[in-house]
Amino acid sequence: MARIKVHELREKSKSDLQNQLKELKAELALLRVAKVTGGAPNKLSKIKVVRKSIAQVLTVSSQKQKSALREAYKNKKLLPLDLRPKKTRAIRRRLTKHQASLKTEREKKKEMYFPIRKYAIKV
């Protein structure tokens, strides 16, 4: 089997990807048997290509699944953890801009009764 082009995989449906994955895994099993029984050298070198193809199929299928989930949760209030942006732990726990801008009643009164003085310089 020749190397698979990823752009061709992206056009396939989910069921086609699953079928291709089964075929590739079956082929890999045959190649491993050939390796143990002392098969031809060209079969041994084919193992790497098949393993890479399996990885490509799995990657494309997981990317499709994740993009479908992103579409499903697009306008929802809460997102699953794996769809949220990956930030540092400290940034995730930081106050939101709204929370940081809130002021206590006492602070509001102090600002209202004692505003910052503005001075104009006479020329």
From Swiss-Prot:
Belongs to the universal ribosomal protein uL29 family. One of its GO terms (molecular function) is mRNA binding. It comes from Arabidopsis thaliana (Mouse-ear cress). InterPro entries: Ribosomal_uL29, Ribosomal_uL29_CS, Ribosomal_uL29_euk, Ribosomal_uL29_sf. SUPFAM superfamilies: Ribosomal protein L29 (L29p) (SSF46561). GO terms for biological process: maturation of LSU-rRNA from tricistronic rRNA transcript (SSU-rRNA, 5.8S rRNA, LSU-rRNA); translation. Keywords: Ribonucleoprotein, Ribosomal protein. This is Large ribosomal subunit protein uL29z. The keyword Lipid metabolism does not apply. GO terms for cellular component: cytosol; cytosolic large ribosomal subunit; nucleolus; plasmodesma. The keyword Protein biosynthesis does not apply.
